[in-house]
């Protein structure tokens, strides 16, 4: 959530910066509400001053033995007007707050300006896509050969956009997640967490999924009790661990990681990636979250992105890094890098990780703060998150990049310790 002071003092500048994201801020509505708020606030303050003066006059009139009934009536009238003014102020503020909850974050000055993914800027590449000397198969066909991927069985259970994994392919999927967690905890300094897969609405509001993106979520309604939502990412549960907290400077940076299933309705993805595991309603992901001092968040973003890249490097999977443009960034991001891995059957790079600096956007929603030792006062932290990595898409990349002419799959060297002696999946 943006600082409301920005809307009061720099409304047009904020509107211009949001326009670069393709977001049209209703300036007239905000100006109208702000004018009403100021007018009611001024009138309320005047009434309070008049009421205080009348109350003082009552004491003086009493001492003189004068009739205080007219003064008492005046005070009662003012009290009623004050109550009405407070109710109106609360209603105006609630409307302003509801607007604030739908406004995306302001892009950093270093973010390339653009309207869509076509305007993203490639920052670097790593590795060279393999030149196969046989006709390559996609991961669905490879999964059929090994009987390791079964989409028909999943459809019987749950419908479209689900998968059943079995045998060595299921083990490879588990190996990938274990490898990622071990790398991030052992070499990158993250603390592993196991968190709930269901959260309530305030947690999703804290990280920005609610109220704007409810249609993308799976909701569990319970009569007489608060609703649950299945997490779309462990970013929600990990980041909200600091909601309402005031952290000591020595606790920062916090580096948290979790391996969880993620659940998304893919409401806006009708007809896209309907084959295979690229876009699923349920998928596993290893998520990294950092909570840092504001002055260090851009540096932390580079480190977070490097942590995600290291997974791909050790798996020897070719990838590229993109700086997302203003029009393609996520709702809460100040700046985002996407990692895209090479998928041979599609002859292109596909997103496998998104690493974002959210500045104080989420922290303001959650009231997550740290005590600045220089001022002694609580201030908002900055939060970052990134996939390290999406496990299902990494499995797709491994199956396709490590395929052999007969449809078998070589196990990447770094995964062999997790595979119980299996070196080739047939």
From Swiss-Prot:
ATP binds at residues 264-266, 351-354. Keywords: Aminoacyl-tRNA synthetase, ATP-binding, Cytoplasm, Ligase, Nucleotide-binding, Protein biosynthesis. Its EC number is 6.1.1.11. SUPFAM superfamilies: Class II aaRS and biotin synthetases, tRNA-binding arm. GO terms for molecular function: ATP binding; serine-tRNA ligase activity. The keyword Lyase does not apply. Its main location: cytoplasm. One of its GO terms (biological process) is seryl-tRNA aminoacylation. It comes from the Bacteria. InterPro entries: aa-tRNA-synt_IIb, aa-tRNA-synth_II, aa-tRNA-synth_II/BPL/LPL, Ser-tRNA-ligase_type_1, Ser-tRNA-synth_1_N, SerRS_1_N_sf, SerRS_core, tRNA-bd_arm. Consists of two distinct domains, a catalytic core and a N-terminal extension that is involved in tRNA binding. Homodimer. The tRNA molecule binds across the dimer. Belongs to the class-II aminoacyl-tRNA synthetase family. Type-1 seryl-tRNA synthetase subfamily. PANTHER family: SERINE--TRNA LIGASE, SERYL-TRNA SYNTHETASE. This is Serine--tRNA ligase. It comes from Pseudomonas putida (strain ATCC 700007 / DSM 6899 / JCM 31910 / BCRC 17059 / LMG 24140 / F1). The lineage of its organism: Bacteria, Pseudomonadati, Pseudomonadota, Gammaproteobacteria, Pseudomonadales.
């Amino acid at each position: 959530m943006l600082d409301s002071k920005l809307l009061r003092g720099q409304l047009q500048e904020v509107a211009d910066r949001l326009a670069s994201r393709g977001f049209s801020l209703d300036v007239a509505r905000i100006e109208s509400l702000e004018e009403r708020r100021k007018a009611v606030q001024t009138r309320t303050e005047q009434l309070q001053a008049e009421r205080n003066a009348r109350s003082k006059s009552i004491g003086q009139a009493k001492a003189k033995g004068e009739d205080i009934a007219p003064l008492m009536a005046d005070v009662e009238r003012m009290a009623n007007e004050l109550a009405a003014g407070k109710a109106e102020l609360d209603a105006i503020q609630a409307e302003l707050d509801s607007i604030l909850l739908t406004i995306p974050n302001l892009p950093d000055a270093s973010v390339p300006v653009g309207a869509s993914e076509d305007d993203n800027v490639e920052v670097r590449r790593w590795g060279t896509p393999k030149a196969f000397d046989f006709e390559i198969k996609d991961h669905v066909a490879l999964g059929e050969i090994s009987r390791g991927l079964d989409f028909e069985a999943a459809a019987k259970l749950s419908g479209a956009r689900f998968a059943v994994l079995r045998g060595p392919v299921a083990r490879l999927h588990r190996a990938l997640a274990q490898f990622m967690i071990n790398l991030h905890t052992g070499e990158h300094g993250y603390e592993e967490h196991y968190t709930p897969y269901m959260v309530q609405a305030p947690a999703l509001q804290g990280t920005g999924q609610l109220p704007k993106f409810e249609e993308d979520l799976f909701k569990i309604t319970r009569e007489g009790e608060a609703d649950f939502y299945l997490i779309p990412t462990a970013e929600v549960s990990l980041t909200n661990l600091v909601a309402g907290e005031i952290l000591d400077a020595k606790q920062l940076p916090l580096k948290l990681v979790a391996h969880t299933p993620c659940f998304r309705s893919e409401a806006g993805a009708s007809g896209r990636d309907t084959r295979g595991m690229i876009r699923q309603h349920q998928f596993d992901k290893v998520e990294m979250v950092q909570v840092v001092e504001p002055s260090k968040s851009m540096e932390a973003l580079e480190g977070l992105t490097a942590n995600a890249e290291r997974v791909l490097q050790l798996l020897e999977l070719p990838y590229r890094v993109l700086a997302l443009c203003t029009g393609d960034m996520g709702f809460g991001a100040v700046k985002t890098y996407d990692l895209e891995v090479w998928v041979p059957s599609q002859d292109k790079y596909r997103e496998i990780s998104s690493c974002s600096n959210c500045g104080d956007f989420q922290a303001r929603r959650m009231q997550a703060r740290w005590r600045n030792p220089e001022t002694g006062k609580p201030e908002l932290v900055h939060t970052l998150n990134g996939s390290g990595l999406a496990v299902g898409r990494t499995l797709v990349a491994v199956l396709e990049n490590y395929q052999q002419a007969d449809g078998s799959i070589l196990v990447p060297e770094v995964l062999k310790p997790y595979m119980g002696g299996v070196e080739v999946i047939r």
